[in-house]
């Protein structure tokens, strides 16, 4: 009996030691990446070396941040206290949620490594521990902090998506990205971003977002976090609520904009959203999600692509129950592009490229101020305010490469193309067709924002085109 108890004690001791050493399953990641030059889209930037963190999950995979592996030409991973590097590649990446899964070519890499279990959303005031490989050293680092709030925030990686995140005062520094945030030997988050100018403020991606990502890739394809295609606004005014015959004083938010075809099919502007996916919607547009008051959009984004979300709305003095389809917007020009090289068309020294957030970011840190109201309106707002005038792919004259054929042009770039040879330009294909199908003696290019037009001699432009490409080292006149 004594022998049995000793063995049982040793077994339990080993389990405790193993559970208390999650760092063995935390991986150091080295990337060698090369981003395009969005202002000169035929070029690429210099190769950049960076480090990040990750951790082992079920299925012999490594979870990390999407931004850690974006534009990576080569990825190397290294185990805890092991100097040997191993080649890895991206299996799945979700830029909208800033998560990625890596696979390692050497199957022996995972021998002896225990997958870290994914826990639940931590409560405010919980103590959490971050583990990773921050910049400034080679060894693993541990920091502790307290969960201060849970809310939807803008994810820096896509730039235009707000998903659930947890704020903590645990240090999350460059290199920590992708590492696990632990509580009670379970992963309660993936470290991913801080706030410039604020000390002791870091954010991690919580289990609901992680589990959504993992469920999404079960069919071997990542779709993303869907949207309902609506915009909510508060409905606080008691007089207006009385006018609408709403009885509950704090239930229901106004649907003030419909941004997708599916939303327009089922809903009307000025409908009142009472409930979404079982969550009552407060007058201030929030819902109570696992004990946290967060924006009601989470009721739709936590659904899977092409699923239907049950909703209750108030319309014409009565309650309606509907099922609202939600979809991922694959043509979202507002979201940062992380793998596909930018499109361009080069003709007579004129470089054309689509208007996108990535293109505007090439203007510098204060890109929104440099871009001006006209370009911001075209990119962000026109499709909602003037859908009939919205372009599927607005085209920019990015720059003009100097040559005698274009020497007299006064407009030298960073302007929106409105039409070419009298044909409205809604996409890059429209632009190319307008140039190549034109038989007149001159090309007339009209620009947006009432900037006027420029004119090119067609025969001279055609003769000069190849020479200009060779002079500036451009191998192809287009990339689509």
Predicted features by range, described:
Residues 34, 49, 70, 93-97, ...:
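Short, conserved beta-turn/loop elements at beta-strand boundaries and strand-helix junctions
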Residues 71-75, 80-89, 123-129, 140-153, ...:
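Beta-strand/loop subdomains of soluble extracytoplasmic proteins
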Residues 58, 66, 89, 103-105, ...:
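C-terminal recognition in membrane/secretory proteostasis and scaffolding
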Residues 25-31, 36-37, 42-45, 105-115, ...:
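Active-site region of chymotrypsin-like
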Residues 6-15:
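Bacterial N-terminal signal peptides
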Residues 58-140, 174, 199, 319-321:
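Conserved active-site neighborhood of the chymotrypsin/trypsin-like protease fold
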Residues 27-29, 54, 60, 64, ...:
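Terminal peptide-recognition signature
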Residues 19-65, 74, 123-128, 212-226, ...:
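N-terminal activation segment of mature serine protease catalytic domains
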